[in-house]
Amino acid sequence: MNILAFGEIMMRLSVPDYKFLTQTNELNYIITGTGLNILSGLKNFGYNTYMLTKLPNNNVGKASSANIRKLGVKDDFITYGGNHIGLFSQNGYGERPSEVTYLNRLNSSFCESKLQDYDIDKCLEEMDIVHICGIAMQLTDSVKEIALELARKSYEKGIKVFFDFNFRQSLNPERTYDDLVNDYKKILPYCHGLFASYRDINKILNIDSLNIKSSSELIKKEYDIGIVAGTMRRFDDMNNRFIKGYISNDDGYFESREYKLEIYDRVGAGDGYVAGIIYSYLENMKSEDIVEFGVASSVLAHTTYGDNSLVSTGHVLRLMNNEKIDILR
């Protein structure tokens, strides 16, 4: 099974020991990005994974591609040009929320890439699944054009497209949420799988009164989507955090059991859910097991340092089966 993801590769800068940036002279970095995080998870689940993106033609780009290969993700379709990679810093602890600070992201090699930089037909020759990150629709007009063309050609070739909304208002302040909704409506007819929140779906459908079950079933019918999936989070009075997943497909609507979260590093946990849903869907699991596998994958991603999903199917299945093991020997 071959899976391609289109999206931006980022460099995440982290301050050690949860300090403020003003308190340190040191930074750690991780090569990350929604597509890469999902692919690393699917690679660990046993699939062949390929990244479609553009990196700077310098040592930063070389280091990034080396990190991509280290995760087992193939870089055959990565192109090079320009001299800048998108940067962001993000750290928080306890009641102090993490803050994401983007550094000149819209001028990165990826954001300045053009359709002619990619041989899309060649990239799709042996692909079974394509994932397109919704952030690609929020950046520059040229990147949006690439995402739409990739979705269209994949659809025409019978390759299933999975798409997530992943809205980030701070990425491009000049574009409103309504602008983005109109662009999402252009790509949805090509999509087989959709990852979305209750808010996202209601905005697309221009409704505000339905629950997630009704909303997901409506958007599935409206755009002839095979599977709609997402997570639901809540807090209790003690500030404990909980998560569960949902899917809506041809078999009906299903929710997972709820997990109390132990959070080591939340960034990338949603990508862990996407990887889990795609894997269990491709493995033809029962609908009840698809959503349980997906949310278990996300729960484990909360316990992993860094954005990239690194857990195995064994890890996920043990959690699904409620096997409490402190040490694997």
Give the predicted meaning of each segment.
Residues 1-20:
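Positively charged, low-complexity intrinsically disordered leader regions
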Residues 33-44, 147-153:
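Histidine-anchored nucleotide/phosphate-binding helix
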Residues 48-134, 316-329:
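Conserved N-terminal subdomain of the carbohydrate kinase-like
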Residues 146-157, 182-190:
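Catalytic-core regions built around general acid/base machinery
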Residues 154-160, 223-226:
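A short helix->loop->beta-strand "cap" motif at the edges of active sites that frequently abuts
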Residues 168-250:
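Conserved phosphate/ATP/ADP-binding segment of small-molecule kinases
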Residues 238, 253-323, 327-329:
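Conserved post-catalytic alpha-helical subdomain immediately downstream of the catalytic base
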